[in-house]
Amino acid sequence: MLMSVFHNWLLEIACENYFVYIKRLSANDTGATGGHQVGLYIPSGIVEKLFPSINHTRELNPSVFLTAHVSSHDCPDSEARAIYYNSRHFGKTRNEKRITRWVEAAHFRILKITGALTLLAFKLDEQGGDCKEVNIWVCASTDEEDVIETAIGEVIPGALISGPAGQILGGLSLQQAPVNHKYILPEDWHLRFPSGSEIIQYAASHYVKNSLDPDEQLLDRRRVEYDIFLLVEELHVLDIIRKGFGSVDEFIALANSVSNRRKSRAGKSLELHLEHLFIEHGLRHFATQAITEGNKKPDFLFPSAGAYHDTEFPVENLRMLAVKTTCKDRWRQILNEADKIHQVHLFTLQEGVSLAQYREMRESGVRLVVPSSLHKKYPEAVRAELMTLGAFIAELTGLYADIP
């Protein structure tokens, strides 16, 4: 029932005059960090389209109000505010646009929406004036998120996808970011789509060379690899789209092919990058997809599958690392993947969690491993307990230093 409501909502938005804004909510977006910059950041180009009346510096912090309706949850409508913080032009430093008050603060706490994939659909003004309303869907389940990511590809934390609703939701969305054409692809890739491992191997020659920090390296490598993936996708799909389709079945077949490839990449990319970084930084004692109790397969088991099943190996020296791009609800899936390990580690790129979510994770025996540059996006009270990727690697290389 709920999924049919979601599908109907998407169809309505795609068929009418809406502009959609899609992202995963960071802790700053929801106020979970406790910082003063609460609200959704809006790029200047979007402000010009949606709220032209505030795109100026004739006065301090011009703003406009609009009605915010949350279709996904039982929340009362609220009065959202689109504001241009332009104090840089008045002797101070701030220069950014945000949407604030789009859901009352109390509902953030109730819904635990930090990390959730969220769609904001702005009803465009037919006369070119300011938008008067925004219709919001905060995905409450992985099933809802899968519907969106099947259509438009993986939505990674920090990424913003926006555009006319019919273009983004109403058909085959080829890309969400400008394709970088600086890469010269191998000739045989013009004839076949390379595997994820092949793309990562090719990308290695384009990584930033002056960093030895695994936290920085991971984020840079993900960016480069994704740029190359988009270029390969364009190479194989764009001409087909331009030529058009002889039937609906042909269109659906291509859409399914693109969707399956995107999901496959999203599921393996992060694990492959971590595996390479472990080896580069001297952490060689690990197993991927090793079988544990109940035929479970954790992403990484340390130091090996053999050690895990060896009754003589010290249990306190076993480690497990689960890998989730986002961890809003998915973190619970990892709790019983290795019964012998009472504190499991979870690597994520999610931009913050609420204090309540963090406490629930900690009480369940989950320790977060997060790239260092993302720590500031978490509530200040928990930052000291977050582990960097570099610290995780250093701890385990030391722990297993005596293993041949």
UniProtKB/Swiss-Prot annotation:
One of its GO terms (biological process) is DNA restriction-modification system. It catalyses: Endonucleolytic cleavage of DNA to give specific double-stranded fragments with terminal 5'-phosphates. Transmembrane segments: none annotated. The keyword Magnesium applies. One of its GO terms (molecular function) is DNA binding. Signal peptide: none annotated. The active site is at 308. Changing residue 308 to F: Abolishes cleavage activity. It holds the Pfam family EcoRII-C. Its EC number is 3.1.21.4. InterPro entries: DNA-bd_pseudobarrel_sf, EcoRII_C_sf, Rest_endonuc_II_EcoRII_N, Restrct_endonuc-II-like, Restrct_endonuc_II_EcoRII_C. It is an enzyme of class 3 (hydrolase). Keywords: Endonuclease, Hydrolase, Magnesium, Nuclease, Restriction system. Its cofactor is Mg(2+). Homodimer. This is Type II restriction enzyme EcoRII. It comes from Escherichia coli. The gene is ecoRIIR.
